[in-house]
């Protein structure tokens, strides 16, 4: 279900403050965040944001094509290694 157009996109306040602070200084430092639910907005373009995937922070460079998506979409939390080759023990 999509978000209502009457509401603004969700961006965590601490993340928005950090981005605005870096934009006023015209710096491009790494921003570390746990907020995977935040929506990417146009002021984030050009920044590198390290998004937590449950184990570590993955640095993601924000481009204009990412605007409107959530930060968590670009940091996968699961890595599927494939099914077991010989699974005879569990077949019984």
Swiss-Prot record:
Signal sequence segment: none
Keyword list, A-Z: Chloroplast, Plastid, Ribonucleoprotein, Ribosomal protein, RNA-binding, rRNA-binding
Main location: plastid
GO cellular component terms, A-Z: chloroplast; mitochondrial small ribosomal subunit
Record bears the keyword Transit peptide: no
Transmembrane stretches, start-end: none
GO BP terms: ribosomal small subunit assembly; translation
PROSITE patterns reported in the protein's UniProt record: RIBOSOMAL_S19
Keyword 4Fe-4S in annotation: no
UniProt subcellular location: Plastid, Chloroplast
GO MF annotations in UniProt: rRNA binding; structural constituent of ribosome
Top-level lineage group: Eukaryota
SUPFAM superfamilies: Ribosomal protein S19
Family to which this protein belongs: Belongs to the universal ribosomal protein uS19 family.
Function field: Protein S19 forms a complex with S13 that binds strongly to the 16S ribosomal RNA.
Protein name as annotated: Small ribosomal subunit protein uS19c
